[in-house]
Amino acid sequence: MSSSTSSVESVEDESCSNECSASFTFDTNNNSRGDQQVDELAEETHMKLSITPTRESFSLSQLERIVTIGKGTFGRVELARDKISGAHYALKVLNIRRVVDMRQTQHVHNEKRVLLQLKHPFIVKMYASEKDSNNLYMIMEFVPGGEMFSYLRASRSFSNSMARFYASEIVCALEYIHSLGIVYRDLKPENLMLSKEGHIKMADFGFAKELRDRTYTICGTPDYLAPESLARTGHNKGVDWWALGILIYEMMVGKPPFRGKTTAEIYDSIIEHKLKFPRSFNLAAKDLVKKLLEVDRTQRIGCMKNGTQDVKDHKWFEKVNWDDTLHLRVEVKKLIGIFLIPIFQPPIVPTLYHPGDTGNFDDYEEDTTGGPLCSQRERDLFAEW
């Protein structure tokens, strides 16, 4: 739940709302975390940072709520710790009155329903839901690496091989959710988290929707909206492939291809489709981005007869072993002395020093009020929560 880039939606219909050349470790807050002894301790404990959750049911009373790690228009995400097992979770807290006032009731129900059926290595897990008299709670996997947006902002842009690594994991995730008839509709760096090992975790499924055919309302972030969404001619999974094209471009350039000072100017830029690439942009990547940003969705790569396979078969991904990608096998060669030693490590490994480390998240003011009180009528909208 990032406030870095705003998402938009139409209020007319509430139903919407493995190759890498180098390895880097980022501390996105640029904090000094201690001396060499601390670094050595981090090295030793790196593989022990997450306690795998084993509880099939949760009670809020069993969770110690520690600190806010994300904030949105009608809710926040907090780090929480199970007092019994010691496991850490991300606790999404949604104020019922704010959800209703923002006409997000159906979105919230959609997110819960979608997340509970998703089980994939590149998608954040949801374990349980709870509610009290004023708030809804979603108990989710804590992904300690923070947002991809933070790393992209710190480095300004990613190399061709880094962008390909992350894009390949996103392709696998999109293939999976599309196979279930689900459209994501909010792909952007702020919604992509990094696991402690450095793999992608897609988060925030508030705009996700199960689709049989098309939906017609505008959902998503202005920079990432597809032309058919703006034209209200109906959209489907093609909007996710369009967004992937925007994301690849932004990863490699540092900013999205269609820009403007206002939302209206961004929309005009998308409709005019003046797509320009820096000279340094990899040619194979350029070809893929052009095919993903095809205005005619029937001719857009990923949307034709062969679906995702066309994307996987594109020449930009020719060095990707898709089975290795899906099973988190990443081989890179690191120069140690005079030898190139194969190691298994994503291009960015988050800086972490202990279980529950929140150093890769921004600081937020804590909310001690619990949000505005809600009425019984508003509570009844979530009677089955």
UniProtKB/Swiss-Prot annotation:
EC number(s) per entry: 2.7.11.11
Entry protein name: cAMP-dependent protein kinase, catalytic subunit-like
Keyword Nucleotide-binding: yes
Keyword Nucleotide-binding assigned: yes
Residue ranges of every copy of the Protein kinase domain listed in the record: 63-317
Residues annotated as the enzyme's active site: 186 (proton acceptor)
Reaction equation(s) it catalyzes: L-seryl-[protein] + ATP = O-phospho-L-seryl-[protein] + ADP + H(+); L-threonyl-[protein] + ATP = O-phospho-L-threonyl-[protein] + ADP + H(+)
Boundaries of every AGC-kinase C-terminal domain copy: 318-385
Family to which the UniProt record says this protein belongs: Belongs to the protein kinase superfamily. Ser/Thr protein kinase family. cAMP subfamily.
Cellular component terms per the entry's GO annotation: cAMP-dependent protein kinase complex; cytosol
One example of a Gene Ontology biological process annotation: cell adhesion
Record-level Gene Ontology MF annotations: ATP binding; cAMP-dependent protein kinase activity; protein serine kinase activity
Keywords: ATP-binding, cAMP, Kinase, Nucleotide-binding, Serine/threonine-protein kinase, Transferase
Residues annotated to bind ATP: 69-77, 92
Pfam families: Pkinase
InterPro entries associated with the record: Kinase-like_dom_sf, Prot_kinase_dom, Protein_kinase_ATP_BS, Ser/Thr_kinase_AS
